[in-house]
């Protein structure tokens, strides 16, 4: 699911297709990529419910083409599970967490743009290709409020490694996985190293008082 879905939640519940629910815990989150993995204890899931659960197959979002048909699954507006259909409108879109488009060279997560309706409640749901494979994770947080037909999903192939890492973490209370070093600095290239006569690495220009770097004596 998305990090912004679970962010700030005191309790989590997973509801299955048969209406049965179990309490869930967070296994891991990545706020930069807006990803989260939650887990429900198998001991609390009845066999009758397990029989109805189908494991999603991950597709290759790199192979999707503009114009391909896709299906978005979610819980739009909290009314229950629903699906919408559309096409891949564009690939390799990049936006920051405020929905502002970024340059192609940006470190922002790769997004698939689609005209399939992605409304509040669809966040964290799957964007499927016509083979039923997951090619994206829908994010209503990035949906445009100014125009219609512009929804976004996180390209699954770009975040598979991150999801694997989060899945292997131990269930816990939510914490931010990203630490803060507490410096302002710049990389020192080989060319800059020779020009200024300083070692390669990172040049620290400022240290935040009381930050981790300050406490470490940097």
Q: What are the functions of these language-model segments?
A:
Residues 1-192, 199-200, 209:
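Serine-dependent protease modules
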